[in-house]
Amino acid sequence: MHPPQRLTRPLVKASLRSTFKLASRTPLPLGVLRASMELGAGLFVARRDVRLSTVKLGAAAALCVVPKRSNKRVLLHLHGGAFFAGSSNTHRAMASELAARCHATLYMLDYRRAPEHAYPAALDDALNAYHALLGQGWMPEQIFLAGDSGGCAHVLSLATALRDQGSPLPAGLILLSPFVDLTLSLPSVTHNAKRDPMLSANILKRGADAYRGKLALNDPRISPLFAPLHDLPPLLIQVGSEEILLDDAVQLAERIQAKGGAVDCQVYQGMWHNFQMFNRLITEAEDALEQIAGFVLKNSHT
């Protein structure tokens, strides 16, 4: 049972403002911010009804999450963290929720991060991981690609790369609070700057600059909002109405639909970045996770 929403929602927002958003505005080194995110991961506990192990998937390590009830489907999740932070540790609880609800094996990939590794290191790791799943015997129609925040840029880049290579495409894409325009030039970045309780443009710009290497921020290889978006698998996009990244999600959905793609863009009123992580406190997060499970079930071909 969830606590009263009139109490928990403002408390969570206040907590995020005084911790995550405050830190995101500082000039602290990226390594310090990365470490603080790892420490904060202790507040989110994985479900007990899943089995966790660390494995090698392609060239990178990954957290493998297997629920008690697992059908023949698999999720490859690329975590967020503005390209320089986040890991299978920070996203362990989310991984357990997605695996259990989708009745799917889930791999949370520890791809190489900026600033130590700029583009295309993360994409290369994701490509290798996807082909490793195929090598294990998974069929493309059994595979879903998922991501949150900056991880969504990697997911879209992976999907478009597979399409352009003529490789088999996965059954669907799941994008949570996508950060896919590294120029940070869309209106919501300004309009929601005060309303967003979690993110600042400052930290996203620092992460984007660390990741892009010598590429321009609007290069479609790193800002997939500007990439050719035709012939993609079905997509589910979820975003909070108070995010500075709201327009990333909305414009991405519009551009894919304009190319004839199937996309369901769900805007959750009053919600913030990656609100799905707070499912034990917020009913909207619980609903969002169930929507993800429904999308996976609908698009499964097993």
Question: Which residue ranges define each predicted feature?
Answer:
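A glycine/proline-hinged amphipathic helix-loop "lid/cap" segment
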Residues: 1-69, 301-302
